[in-house]
Amino acid sequence: MGDKIFHNLSGKTLVATPHVITKGIYHKSLIYMLSHTEEGAIGLIFNRLVNHIDLKSFFKIKNDEITTPVMVPIYLGGPVEHEKGFFLHSSDYNKNLLLDFHNDLAVSSNLEISEDIAFGKGPKNSLFIVGYTAWKPGQLEEELETNLWLVMDCNKEFIFADNPESKWHNALKHLGIDEIHFSSQIGNA
């Protein structure tokens, strides 16, 4: 038995296959891959809109200059550590980045970005995401082999599109797949 080749998926998007993942948090999910190494993987679901929050009250921003609520959508990034929040954003904002990608995207998780967004000085595009998705070593590779996920390149226009409910369908369309014609009987040739 030969060694498996490792393909780093950091900066890519995972698209849940429509007939394999049929319920739960991953049903019709899109996951932006933050990190993928031989030690495991971490990603953020970016199409699970949960609610809207006021940045000023949520982050307890103490500033009287902001007199009206600054409402932003909040997304569920996965089942792990819901108390952790991340801003997945365009790379035009580069203060105290947690991660920076080569596809015009970055991730921040500090209070400064929430204040900058509230004051209109933040990134042009951003999503506030709580929680994340994680895989143990080899787990994601196994899920890919069993066709739980499709992989696609991603760009900021796709991630920051207005309608989160249509992002998954748009991802399939981008891949040239019509959900109606997607077989529930899939496998590797």
Curated annotation (Swiss-Prot):
Signal peptide: none annotated. InterPro entries: AlgH-like (IPR003774). Disulfide bonds: none annotated. Transmembrane segments: none annotated. It comes from the Bacteria. GO terms for cellular component: cytosol. Pfam families: DUF179 (PF02622). Belongs to the UPF0301 (AlgH) family. This is UPF0301 protein RC0043. The lineage of its organism: Bacteria, Pseudomonadati, Pseudomonadota, Alphaproteobacteria, Rickettsiales.
